[in-house]
């Protein structure tokens, strides 16, 4: 990844906590429990999914930085989205994401060019994944899910 792509991805991860909080600001319980698309997750589930997904990514980052090509586990995000913790107030996951991203950025700030090339093995991908790939993917993931919520708000006039 070129340095401008890397900077953008790190920036996207850095601003996600604020963007996600703003995206759900002022929504009532019924709105939080509205799917962002037919057959899709509710806004509440999306917020909790971001926390789940980014926790997994953070642990994978730490493993890749401290182990030699570690294998990581896949998880069923659809099943995760159905567990009881996804009925909690979104503030629980918003605070988790805020704290997690502060730690994530602290690590990113200390990484060398060599660190960004470190890899981990994911069972759903045929090749090892680099940390520069991971940061770009989660920068996209951050924008992607905020856009789901903001598009729903525009459609519904919220």
Predicted feature residues:
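A short secondary-structure junction motif
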Residues: 23, 27-30, 68, 111-114, ...
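Acidic/histidine-rich alpha-helical segments that form the ligand environment
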Residues: 12-23, 80-118, 138
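Amphipathic, non-membrane alpha-helical segments in soluble helical-bundle scaffolds
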Residues: 6-17, 40-47, 90-94, 132-135
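Low-complexity, intrinsically disordered short peptide segments enriched in small/polar/basic residues
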Residues: 7-10, 21, 143-146
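Short, contiguous alpha-helical
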Residues: 33-78, 83, 105-106, 117-158
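A glycine-rich, hydrophobic loop/mini-helix early in the fold
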Residues: 14-40
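Short, small-residue-biased leader/transition segments that mark boundaries at the very start
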Residues: 1-3
């Amino acid at each position: 990844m070129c340095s401008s792509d890397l900077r953008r991805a790190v920036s996207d991860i850095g601003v996600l906590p604020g963007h996600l909080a703003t995206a759900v600001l002022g929504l009532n319980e019924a709105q939080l429990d509205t799917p962002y698309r037919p057959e899709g997750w509710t806004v509440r589930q999306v917020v909790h999914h971001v926390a789940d997904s980014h926790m997994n990514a953070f642990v994978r980052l730490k493993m890749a930085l401290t182990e030699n090509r570690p294998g990581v586990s896949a998880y069923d995000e659809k099943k995760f989205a159905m567990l009881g913790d996804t009925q909690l107030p979104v503030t629980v996951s918003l605070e988790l994401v805020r704290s997690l991203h502060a730690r994530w950025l602290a690590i990113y700030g200390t990484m060398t060019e060599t660190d960004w090339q470190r890899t981990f093995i994911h069972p759903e991908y045929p090749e090892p994944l680099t940390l520069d790939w991971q940061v770009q993917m989660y920068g996209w993931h951050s924008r992607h899910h905020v856009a789901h919520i903001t598009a729903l708000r525009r459609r519904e006039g919220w």
